[in-house]
Amino acid sequence: MSEVRVADALAAARRQGVDRLDAQLLLARLLQRPREWLIAHDDAPLSVGQQQRFAADCARRAAGEPLAYLLGEREFHGLMLQVGPGVLVPRPDTETLVDWALELLAAKPGAAPAVADLGTGSGAIALALKHARPDARICAVEHSEVALAVARANGRRHGLDVQWQAGSWWQPLQGQRFDLVLSNPPYIAAGDPHLAALRHEPLQALSPGGDGLSDLRHIVQGAPLHLQPGGWLLLEHGHDQAEAVRALLLQADFTQVTTRSDLGGRPRCSGGRRAVRAPSDA
């Protein structure tokens, strides 16, 4: 290969269809330099090996592989988290769920709250909550061994003490009750055209099949046995599923049922409160 400079490599990446920022981040990681360095040193030469590795990364990105997989990490709610194949990439819209949870916890002073995160994936939700509320006792459940290993690694990386539990939804939490439960479960319906664009991420973390509501139904149905009276259940869902999820919560006798929108203004999270004095507590 002839001599290739930083500017040449970035121009070639754009011709491949790679976004300018994505290409800069990939090259900065490869060179172990900040992105600003690339801008100030666009005439710096690349070795043959660097050219080859950058071209390979750009080809993968152009084919739709998530940038987070190529970089090996993704920022979420102020925390840089390890991610990789087999683990769902944390989305900024899920921060809506975390912010809502923190509001509820702030409104309930007193003893350290008990919180559960069902289907934790990379640990994003659980770790963001623990980082913001070190006093909280947080339990995170995940059925994927690959994802759970990543979540544990992220916890160690940030020195955050979360109780990691292997299992499916409520199964590892028998006999436990919480003040707050959150979940970002698989909710994309089978056949949804968006799934094709997400083909590099684990299907089981994206879609439960059918109408996309089966895991949400299971979580709502089991929640009364695992929430303290007055406890809250918060759920992420598809932008067109808010009405259906609110109906599930109302059918399970939740009160104060409401929906919040994501960063783009789309209905993204719904939640409700278990009655302060439920029939089972009488």
Set out the residue ranges of the language-model regions.
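Mobile active-site "lid"/loop adjacent to the S-adenosyl-L-methionine
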Residues: 186-215
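Residue-level signal for inorganic ion chemistry
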Residues: 26, 64, 94, 125, ...
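Flexible, glycine-/basic-rich loop-and-beta segments that form/coincide
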Residues: 276-282
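Conserved Class I SAM-dependent methyltransferase catalytic core
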Residues: 211-274
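Non-catalytic nucleic-acid substrate-recognition regions in nucleic-acid-modifying enzymes
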Residues: 1-20
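Conserved SAM/SAH cofactor-binding pocket of Class I
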Residues: 96-195
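Conserved beta-strand segments of alpha/beta enzyme cores
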Residues: 80, 137, 161-163, 255-258
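Conserved AdoMet
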Residues: 25-103
